Amino acid sequence: MASWNSIPLEISYEIVGWIAFASWSISFYPQLILNFRRRSVVGLNFDFVMLNLTKHSSYMIYNVCLYFSPVIQKQYFDTYGDKEMIPVAANDVAFSIHAVVMTAVTLFQIFIYERGPQKVSRLAIGIVVVVWGFAAICFFIALPTHSWLWLISIFNSIQVFMTCVKYIPQAKMNFTRKSTVGWSIGNILLDFTGGLANYLQMVIQSIDQNSWKNFYGNMGKTLLSLISIFFDILFMFQHYVLYPEKKVSKSPETGEESNEPLIDSSHEHV
């Protein structure tokens, strides 16, 4: 297993990593606090929360397994070389566990607070069922040969796919309502900061090791930040340019705005 060549770079790696952890972790709280203060989740898309829970759960499985399992680490070194470093840091593990818990809390708020006519769409439910069904099939494929690195790579790919999909319902809802009221911009600003810090952390490791294998050795982490940053910019454009709050004429507590999920209401499912 490789070790750090530069102590300053190692320290910088840890600092930047925990900045990413703090930014991403704190990003969950503005939405939770907003929901709590309003006693309402009107404006928050339920499909987003449902898909986000699957995304973070799959990311947690990947991080925890690769970080703690000597067997999977050996398979990683056999694949990418024993001079490479494991592309998962302690802050990645801490963040993914925290993310699952906070997303579950947000889901709980949906059940207890005023939510208007919105429901989770059948399409979102279908995506979640298919994804976990696919993961179960992959588990039984990996079991006979103990191909655990391949299996957790599947979970890593799942979280990338879910990252691509999960933002679409919220972006569509903002466009339909011509408003971002009820959707916390604080979440987006912190998520954007975390994405940039995450990339910087990977660059620091690559410079120290004189190798860029950690980018494609953990393609999920690489694509995660890229996709998140893209949608963060889109949401900031919606919030500050297209639909600034001063243009909103209806109070979100009334629940009168359109709250469409990923598909038309005619296809909604309880």
UniProtKB/Swiss-Prot annotation:
Disordered: annotated span: 250-270
Protein's membrane topology: Multi-pass membrane protein
Organism for this UniProt entry: Arabidopsis thaliana (Mouse-ear cress)
Annotated localization: Lysosome membrane
GO cellular component assignments: lysosomal membrane; plant-type vacuole
SMART domains: CTNS (SM00679)
Protein name: Cystinosin homolog
Domain of life according to the entry: Eukaryota
GO molecular function: L-amino acid transmembrane transporter activity
Subcellular location, principal: membrane
PQ-loop domain mapped to chain residues: 9-75, 151-213
Sequence intervals crossing the membrane: 14-34, 93-113, 123-143, 148-168, 180-200, 223-243
NCBIfam families associated with the record: 2A43
Any Pfam family hit: PQ-loop
Keywords assigned by UniProt, alphabetized: Glycoprotein, Lysosome, Membrane, Repeat, Transmembrane, Transmembrane helix, Transport
Glycan-bearing residues: N52, N174
Role of this protein: Thought to transport cystine out of lysosomes.
Similarity comment: family membership: Belongs to the cystinosin (TC 2.A.43.1) family.
